Amino acid sequence: MKESSLKLAKKVTVSEITNKISSAKAIAFAEYRGLTVAQLKEMRVEAKKVGVELKVYKNRLFKLATDKLGYDLSSFLVGANIFAFSNDDDMSAAKLLVKFAKKHKEFVVLKAGTFEGKVVDTQELKKVAALPSYEEALTILARSLMAPLQQLSLGLKLVSEQKSN
């Protein structure tokens, strides 16, 4: 007995979602309702800038894919959701959706995501978004390492000036 083309299309979509989740470093998703086309376009442009891929899937198909991979996201998969897949780093997807949810509070509701292979809820998603990026963390580290050296240098300079006087 042959499978219907609709059933085959659904299997292909589930396979696509499974591949996207497997290859993504992190995922975040939010419920969106009432957004204008211009607002969605703005979100997609912003996503492209930060290396995040946005997709809209049926919740049931997304649930089938996440169940295959061992993620229990079923309680969050209600309403019209937009899924953000971050392939470059662990925080871009969360940062994008948190930023957009703040800007459009009445239209976007953060749901959940994955971070370091674990399911995270809305509160944890916000915490992930607040973390500095890799480059920002390196800058903070460099500054904190330079401060004591600068103070030592200044102290030695003052001591040498006092001895010369």
Swiss-Prot record:
Entry GO terms, CC: ribonucleoprotein complex; ribosome
Domain of life the protein comes from: Bacteria
GO MF entries: large ribosomal subunit rRNA binding
Keywords, comma-separated and alphabetical: Ribonucleoprotein, Ribosomal protein, RNA-binding, rRNA-binding
GO biological process, one term: translation
InterPro entries for this protein: Ribosomal_uL10, Ribosomal_uL10-like_sf, Ribosomal_uL10_bac, Ribosomal_uL10_bac_type
Statement: the UniProt record of this protein carries the keyword Transcription regulation: no
Pfam families: Ribosomal_L10
Gene3D superfamilies according to UniProt: 3.30.70.1730
Family statement drawn from the similarity comment of this UniProt entry: Belongs to the universal ribosomal protein uL10 family.
Function according to Swiss-Prot or TrEMBL: Forms part of the ribosomal stalk, playing a central role in the interaction of the ribosome with GTP-bound translation factors.
Record text on subunit structure and interactions: Part of the ribosomal stalk of the 50S ribosomal subunit. The N-terminus interacts with L11 and the large rRNA to form the base of the stalk. The C-terminus forms an elongated spine to which L12 dimers bind in a sequential fashion forming a multimeric L10(L12)X complex.
Protein name listed in UniProt: Large ribosomal subunit protein uL10
Encoding gene, per UniProt annotation: rplJ
